Amino acid sequence: MNSGEKIGIITCANATIEMDCCAAPCLRDLNAHLGSFAEHHENPPILAGMITCAGCPTLAYPEKIMRKVGALVEFEITTIHFSYCMVAMCPFLNKYIEIIGKEHPHVRLIKGTHVSSLSHEQFREYVNIACKNQMNMNDVIKRRVTERS
């Protein structure tokens, strides 16, 4: 990787829009070169842009993410990281990777952003509890959601 490589992050539209996630853990680990960004530690990347996915349901038309990805590619990104929440929750992630990879084979696609002490199953359960209790992603991130919430 060259110094100053331009990367993009795709976050989950539901987590970002419906649950008010500001991507703070993603950005924290980007800046600290942790999680999926650890491989960039010798040549810190430049975050060229962040977008949300195309939203659910995209089973019938997953290609709609390509318009959003096009906005990143126009700025010459070389790598796209899919956020932790997408890796943990998105039933369309592999389809997105297939479609983006076919259209933009020069762009590296990496599953994940930040480190989490929660398993994907625990994360999904906490998000489910947060949704039922009208909480947001900050409640999940800051661990204000428990099995008893």
Predicted regions and their residues:
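Short, aromatic/basic amphipathic alpha-helical patches
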Residues: 93-103
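Conserved mixed alpha/beta catalytic, RNA-binding, or beta-rich assembly cores of soluble enzyme
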Residues: 1-72, 86, 92, 107, ...
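N-terminal cationic-hydrophobic initiation segments that often serve targeting/anchoring roles
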Residues: 72-73, 101
